[in-house]
Amino acid sequence: MTSVKEQAAISRLLSFLQEWDNAGKGLRNQILTTFIETNEGKTGPELELEFSQGASLFLIRVTTWLRIIYMTGLELEKILRSIGIFLSAVSSNRYLLEFLEIGGVLTLLEILGIEKINEEDKKESIKLLQIIANTGRKYKELICESYGVRAIAEFLAKSKSEETQEEVQVLLETLVHGNPKYQNQVYKGLIALLPCGSPKAQRLALQTLKTAQSIVGATHPSIVDRVLTVLSTVHLEVQYEAIELIKDLIHYDVRLPLLKGLVALLMPPVKETSKLQAKIFSDSSILQTTTQLPVFLQQAAAAKTIGILARNDLNLAVELLNLRVVHGLMSAMGNTDHSNSQRLASLTLEYFVQMFPLVEEQVRKSMGDELYQLFLNDAEILYTKIDSIQADILAANKVNATTDSCDCIDNSSISFSTGSNDMSQRGYTNDFEKLHSKSKE
């Protein structure tokens, strides 16, 4: 038999629930505001005490209302925050199960894809998915089984809020950890994100891919082309993350395709540059935008990446030699349509010349004494000193400085000139240093 006190508490609960059931949109928002203010941070037992062991009855009502109105575009933030109080409460697994039983995960994922729902509401939906994913492996699997990876990745690509995008990254990282059944699905979803039009989404996807790659192990065949395509970006912070991922990927089974791809980018296809020439003849204003042509941006980024890889690993430098990287670098140095390609290719070539006497000999013969002396004086500003004839000499070079072109390359044929190499590295990476200094401010 219940006590008078318990009966009074039950009566208050029933009165509260009846008020909710009879309330319109405005009053329900007021009820939720009060609920959030008085119950945020409470544990499961504390919520039960607050609702006289009937907290689930209120959760079901709030969730049902969410499912009824979420497609209308009405504000959902208070509803989602109220549900979050239940799901995040300590000792609240019961609430989570009740939320999932009535299709909570599917509702949260569908919210992400509805255009008329505002960004803040979608961010709250992501936060609830984070809570669910952090509860355990089977809940991560449930999200993935509900086509969650695709919905979450598409939202990351379309989101206009950097803060929201960072919340999505946290969710994707959670889904790739401790989720062996679906970690490959998350990994492929991240790769699919790379061509998207949002620089922030690209950057976050690249960062998360580094983590995912170390967990998954085996690489997906499409990752090479996707990452190399990202090098055409005009955004230095995206380029930086792409190069960082490439530095990891060369330790996997895509090492050779990656290196071949980078060397190939040094020499854009003739059809691409021919298209540009035709446009220039028909529209002189195109001249002002050639520095942003994707193939030239890729060319410059490839020269930078090759320099970083070669400086970090001498064995890689030798592999690059065998892929005729010197020929490609000199060709890029002759690209008068893109000065940054010339500058970065020149700095990278300087390293190979310093490290390999074989390269030094062939480059000197190909350039001629006058041009080679200009190169030695200051590789970084060589592009400002050369004329059109010298540029043509570089672009049309026939250098074939590979290990096959001499008897051998061993330690005795490698020059370690640390002083000038350090100077080259400073000039070579100054874009990244500027970027990092800004991010620290």
Predicted segments, located by residue:
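Intrinsically disordered, low-complexity regulatory regions
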Residues: 1-72, 81-83, 248, 270-295, ...
